[in-house]
């Protein structure tokens, strides 16, 4: 996708979320502001043009200013032209970038007049970097945060642009480092800044696993987190990693004489002119991977170097350089052909759909046909990738030559909502700043029957409190979400995870075939009711189908929310 295409998508998204005010449009029509190299001055003026949608307030958490010497600029005084605001102006310049106390964070009532913050520096200096931490008293009130602003230094414009919302679904995978405006590209100056930047010097230096690096970074930026422990009943119980599902053995689940495998890509998830995959793996009769030395791969585009990316093994990624992406025309189907040097017993194909970003995930394959030795074996509906890597988004396609329609599941007569990925975003708690949890979640099929959810269908991010460096073997892991009892006050039967700055906890139910659900029942956390979930949103394959509030639990009663999808 070209840069112009991405800009068009962003523009359309902005129009849907929030129409700019007239004065914003007029400002954009005025003279452009070019970001200068190391602007010099003493009085920094921040003109707050709009917020992210709140109709009454606009606010900021804090502002960090670094000079050409790498040190923080000393600010003598902060003033504003508005009279109605909460919090103190001094809170904007303290090194407490992740505060979530609404009484301390600065927030002003919107007026017809443009809101201006004036920061007077102790002495004239050259500005190298300014970082903004947007308003984030809670994820529900993130729309109070500044969206468009201008900066003037001694009356000269040095920046006009947009700040990210403090709670942005599209940016949650990115490390939380605030919104940075650079006034230099000098490596020497940036290295000097790094020596004084609390966001960098507080990160751990020892090597850690890729799967936990994002969560550990966020935790090191969090204020003191009170300890929590529920491991005394089983102190030596390790936290086990759930193995991948074992393909069931059936008499017709695979063929022993596979010489050629042909995959015909019929459609994508909506991207115009492109289709792609992150990776493929071939599984034999013993549930072992077939080594790529045993076959050759050709694709209809004829690019052998590009086709190698399909089997490079780097499948849990958002790096487009590790993915396969080609031009697509629905009138001329794209094909992937695999020829085995010797006949093999092929049981399944593991597929990772295209995952470079949320927008580009729509280039992923949607419908495909699978041929073995020239014979149609299966029609496949592939799940769209998520655009992030909160869990292993692999989809296992088990081959059954006696059934070509299994993956095209009809909806049936009863009302229900179908999809591949059901996601529950946990947006806020009933008061706790550090932890969030649930007792359990139940899914009901279109017949109204409780579904048996297996562990490989469940993913949670963060998985549990065990991701924190100081907690090990806590029993409140994510598998408790799908095991009974749910109406309980016994902590080891519950799920608890860490609240990370500017991220929401998420629970995913992921299926390899389109699955229809008629009802979701959520049981709130009971051991410490203020750690229970308050606000949630539910999406099915990226479409929001519900948002609301879960009642708080008490010491004697488990709060629960029943979401009847037949009413939606």
UniProtKB/Swiss-Prot annotation:
Disulfide pairings: none
UniProt entry tagged with the keyword Cytoplasm: yes
Compositionally biased residues, Basic and acidic residues: 1-20
Disordered: annotated segments: 1-30
UniProt source species: Caenorhabditis elegans
Free-text function comment from the UniProt entry: May regulate ciliary A-tubule number and, along with arl-13, controls cilium integrity.
InterPro entries documented for this protein: KATNIP, KATNIP_dom
Protein name: Protein KATNIP homolog
Location in or out of the cell: Cytoplasm, Cytoskeleton, Cilium axoneme; Cytoplasm, Cytoskeleton, Cilium basal body
């Amino acid at each position: 996708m070209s840069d112009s295409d991405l800009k068009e998508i962003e523009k359309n998204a902005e129009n849907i979320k929030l129409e700019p005010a007239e004065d914003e449009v007029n400002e954009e029509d005025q003279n452009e502001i070019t970001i200068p190299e190391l602007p010099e001055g003493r009085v920094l003026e921040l003109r707050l043009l709009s917020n992210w949608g709140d109709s009454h307030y606009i606010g900021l958490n804090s502002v960090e200013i670094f000079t050409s010497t790498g040190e923080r600029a000393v600010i003598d005084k902060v003033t504003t032209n508005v009279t109605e605001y909460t919090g103190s102006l001094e809170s904007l310049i303290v090194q407490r970038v992740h505060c979530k106390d609404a009484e301390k964070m600065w927030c002003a009532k919107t007026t017809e007049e443009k809101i201006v913050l004036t920061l007077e520096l102790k002495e004239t200096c050259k500005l190298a970097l300014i970082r903004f931490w947007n308003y984030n008293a809670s994820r529900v009130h993130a729309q109070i945060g500044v969206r468009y602003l201008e900066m003037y230094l001694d009356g000269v414009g040095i920046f006009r642009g947009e700040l990210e919302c403090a709670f942005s679904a599209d940016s949650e995978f990115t490390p939380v480092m605030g919104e940075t405006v650079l006034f230099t590209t000098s490596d020497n100056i940036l290295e000097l800044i790094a020596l004084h930047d609390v966001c960098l010097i507080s990160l751990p230096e020892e090597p850690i696993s890729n799967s936990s690096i994002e969560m550990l970074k966020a935790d090191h930026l969090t204020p003191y987190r009170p300890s929590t422990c529920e491991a005394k009943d089983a102190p030596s119980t390790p936290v086990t990693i759930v193995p991948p599902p074992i393909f069931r053995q059936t008499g017709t689940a695979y063929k022993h004489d596979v010489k050629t495998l042909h995959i015909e890509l019929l459609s994508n998830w909506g991207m115009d002119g492109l289709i792609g995959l992150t990776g493929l793996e071939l599984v034999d009769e013993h549930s072992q991977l077939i080594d790529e030395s045993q076959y050759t791969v050709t694709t209809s585009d004829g690019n052998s170097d590009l086709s190698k990316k399909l089997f490079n093994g780097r499948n849990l990624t958002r790096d487009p350089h590790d993915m396969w992406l080609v031009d697509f025309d629905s009138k001329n189907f794209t094909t992937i052909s695999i020829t085995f040097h010797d006949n093999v017993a092929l049981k399944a194909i593991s597929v990772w759909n295209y995952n470079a970003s949320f927008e580009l995930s729509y280039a992923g394959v949607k419908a495909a046909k699978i041929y073995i030795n020239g014979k149609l074996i299966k029609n496949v509906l592939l799940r769209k990738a998520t655009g992030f890597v909160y869990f292993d988004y692999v989809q296992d396609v088990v081959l059954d030559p006696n059934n070509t329609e299994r993956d095209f599941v009809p909806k049936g007569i009863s009302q229900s909502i179908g999809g591949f990925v059901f996601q529950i975003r946990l947006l806020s708690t009933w008061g706790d700043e550090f932890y969030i949890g649930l007792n359990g979640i139940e899914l009901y099929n279109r017949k109204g029957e409780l579904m048996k959810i297996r562990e490989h269908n469940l993913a949670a991010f963060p998985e549990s409190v065990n991701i924190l460096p100081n907690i090990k073997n806590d029993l409140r892991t994510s598998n408790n979400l799908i095991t009974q009892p749910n109406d309980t006050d016994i902590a080891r039967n519950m799920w608890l995870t860490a609240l990370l700055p500017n991220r929401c906890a998420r629970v995913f139910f992921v299926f390899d075939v389109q699955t229809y659900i008629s009802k979701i029942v959520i049981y709130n956390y009971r051991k410490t009711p203020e750690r229970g979930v308050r606000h949630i949103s539910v999406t099915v394959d990226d479409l929001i189908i519900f948002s609301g509030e879960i009642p708080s639990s008490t010491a004697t009663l488990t709060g629960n929310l029943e979401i009847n999808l037949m009413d939606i």
